[in-house]
Each structure stands twice: as C-alpha cells, then as structure tokens.
Design a protein with these regions (language model features):
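A structural signal for small-residue-enriched, beta-sheet-centric alpha/beta enzyme cores
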Residues: 1, 5, 25-130
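Phosphate-interacting basic helix/loop segments used at nucleotide- and nucleic-acid interfaces
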Residues: 6-28
C-alpha cells in the first residue's frame, strides 16, 4: 500500500511549481494543487483547489446586478475549486495523469502569485464544522 501525503503548504508548492515552469519555459501560468473532497450534505467527492498561485481564487460578484437588474448579495464564484473540478474531469481520476493544462481562462490568471487558496477558508466564527 502507498500513502501520498499532501503538501504542508499547498500554496507555497503552487508558487514553486509556477516559478519552475517560468524558468524552464518562459511562461508564467496559473498553477493549482488539488485534492478530492467529500461534501457534508452530498454523496460523492469533488476535486477542490488546496493550493494555487497566479489565479483569482474567488470572483466576488456581490454588488453587481443579475440579468434582471437585481443586486447580487451573496454570489462569490469559487473559481479555483471549479477549475480544479473541471481539470479532474478532463484527466480521468484513474489515469495517473499528474497535470492538466486548462485554457480559455485568461481573465482569471494574475501576474502576481496572489493570496493563494488559504484566502478562501472561512473564519472560525463562520465555520459550521469547527
């Protein structure tokens, strides 16, 4: 049997991978580190981002208006998690493919490393499971 440990700091791992890709290929892509995640009120698992660099983690739409002119009060799109889930579907869970290239999301790629996935964790007072 084999156990694969998660990185202690997945955001730092994503930054190191991003820097290595830039050094080797002269491009600076966004990088995600992901893992399977069980969901409290649903069966099945989904892939979520546990570390990232160079990607908008959350796209906050609060204050914008919807297609009917109503103000959005709660909408915060979990970009990093959605990209992680899409990449997982593209690679096939059992394929042993360690990386996926996702294109067409330039609007979410940032020049700097950004705050990382740690920025999407809830504060303890808002966390129902602590």
């Amino acid at each position: 049997d084999t156990v694969l440990l998660l990185p202690e700091d997945a955001d730092a791992s994503a930054r190191r991978i991003r820097d290595a890709i830039e050094a080797a290929a002269s491009v600076r892509p966004a990088v995600l580190v992901s893992d399977s995640f069980g969901r409290a009120w649903r069966t099945g698992q989904a892939e979520v981002a546990i570390g990232c660099a160079g990607l908008t983690v959350i796209d906050d739409w609060r204050g914008r208006t919807d297609s009917h002119g109503r103000e959005l009060a709660a909408t915060m799109i979990a970009v990093a998690d959605q990209v992680a889930a899409a990449a997982d579907l593209a690679r096939d869970k059992t394929s042993r493919t360690p990386a996926v290239i996702v294109s067409g999301l330039d609007r979410y790629v940032t020049g700097d490393d950004g705050p990382g996935c740690v920025s999407q964790l809830r504060e303890p007072a808002e966390d129902l499971f602590r």
